[in-house]
Amino acid sequence: MSLISAGRVCARILGAKNSPCALIAARQASSSTNLKDVLSDLIPKEQTRIKNFKQQHGKTVIGQVTVDMVYGGMRGMKGLVYETSVLDPDEGIRFRGYSIPECQKLLPKAPGGEEPLPEGLFWLLVTGEVPNQDQVNWISKEWAKRAALPSHVVTMLDNFPTNLHPMSQLSAAITALNSESNFARAYAEGVNKAKYWELVYEDSMDLIAKLPCVAAKIYRNLYREGSSIGAIDSNLDWSDNFTNMLGYTDQQFTELMRLYLTIHSDHEGGNVSAHTSHLVGSALSDPYLSFSAAMNGLAGPLHGLANQEVLVWLTSLQKDLGGEVSDEKLRDYIWNTLNSGRVVPGYGHAVLRKTDPRYTCQREFALKHLPDDPMFKLVAQLYKIVPNILLEQGKAKNPWPNVDAHSGVLLQYYGMTEMNYYTVLFGVSRALGVLSQLIWSRALGFPLERPKSMSTDGLMQLVGSKSG
């Protein structure tokens, strides 16, 4: 039994939406190390389950839509099926039912390492099953085998102007990789739609494999005078190869990267990057085009650039107030920020109503590896002070820190000071989640997304007719 069925069975039995069955060993079911073979077994069962569910409940009403929802970015509107993760307002993200602490405990790790390997999370997101070490090793070697970039993409990256933002370079390079798309080629030749998922799987595996090379090349070109990224080592895991290509050899930084790439991978389906990938993919655009579009969304200040804005604000705070700051001075500074009409970056979330568990696991990493770092101390001090001020102000629905409040500080500590680049790391990680879902979207035959739009006059008439 996979998570896809086991989690729901457990929830029904125990009457809980997040049951202790998240730790059931039976979800480590498949013995094959070939991910595609495992999927080939899972997909027909899930197709049948959903077909039966739709036949029985296809006309069932699952919620109401208000005028505020329509004008408010569709917040809270139930309108997407997204299998790989669910965001609970109180508990935070669950990857196929597993919390971040559970993933840290259960997913395989590198020899001598303590953080989960992103390869293991990808296996979990795709299959719903916790992989064993052999399955994770298979993914690592498979991605190493697929990692080489075509020459035209290398030439393209080497000729970008240095004032072109790293995210623009990432998006353009991913789009150019579309020349390698198995899906686009087969679709043009009239492939049967039952084969769509297999082609999307191949493209997704290729793209994830190549992303560290693209991202490292951007970094080297912009910040390391165009020095070589070197070669992929098939004996190393995905994160280790990535940090080596970036030019970092500290194994603590590699451990941080494993954690970072794991926790930023997915955040259910309604956020801008995940929804964009789903929307563009629903037009049967190939994974390269779908993911490139997602990266353009991630580049927005309200999505992936937030961690950069946090660090800019922290640096400005340090410059204004000096080294060690008293709690009283910090409170005054925060109130001045709020009273000037600005927000405290890194606090609040559209869905979460508690401290983001992605913040918590980064805090725990810092407490273990860099407890005396001045910037970390400042972040920890803010954690004690900011929520109470936001509650006192009375405007924030969620006064607690999110993932962006911490990640930049950790990267800075290990020497990655180039803030413009941070969202590229976020993008590399996000591929694990949105491409896992893209495989399933094609496997389940999800149609072209086409919601109904209305004008303000039309809404007013509708409301008038309903209230009349």
UniProtKB/Swiss-Prot annotation:
Its Enzyme Commission number(s) read 2.3.3.1
Q: Which GO terms describe its biological process?
A: carbohydrate metabolic process; citrate metabolic process; tricarboxylic acid cycle
Classification via InterPro entries: Citrate_synth-like_lrg_a-sub (IPR016142), Citrate_synth-like_sm_a-sub (IPR016143), Citrate_synthase (IPR002020), Citrate_synthase_AS (IPR019810), Citrate_synthase_euk (IPR010109), Citrate_synthase_sf (IPR036969)
User: Catalytic center at which residues?
Assistant: H303, H349, D404
This entry's Gene Ontology molecular function terms read: citrate (Si)-synthase activity; identical protein binding
- Superkingdom as given in the UniProt entry: Eukaryota
The record lists oxaloacetate as bound by: R358, R430, R450
Q: What class of enzyme is it?
A: transferase
Its annotated pathway reads: Carbohydrate metabolism; tricarboxylic acid cycle; isocitrate from oxaloacetate: step 1/2
- One Pfam match, given by its short name, reads Citrate_synt
Q: Where is the transit peptide?
A: 1-30
Primary location class: mitochondrion
Give the reaction(s) catalysed.
oxaloacetate + acetyl-CoA + H2O = citrate + CoA + H(+)
Per UniProt, the keywords (alphabetical) are: Mitochondrion, Transferase, Transit peptide, Tricarboxylic acid cycle
Entry's localization field: Mitochondrion matrix
Q: Which GO terms describe its cellular component?
A: mitochondrial matrix
**Family recorded in the similarity comment:** Belongs to the citrate synthase family.
- Which PANTHER family does UniProt cross-reference here? CITRATE SYNTHASE, CITRATE SYNTHASE, MITOCHONDRIAL
Listed under subunit, the entry gives: Homodimer.
Q: What else is known?
A: Citrate synthase is found in nearly all cells capable of oxidative metabolism.
- What is its biological role? Key enzyme of the Krebs tricarboxylic acid cycle which catalyzes the synthesis of citrate from acetyl coenzyme A and oxaloacetate.
Record-linked NCBIfam families = cit_synth_euk, PRK09569.1
UniProt name for this protein: Citrate synthase, mitochondrial
Q: Which organism is it from?
A: Xenopus laevis (African clawed frog)
Organism phylogeny: Eukaryota, Metazoa, Chordata, Craniata, Vertebrata
Q: What is the gene called? A: cs
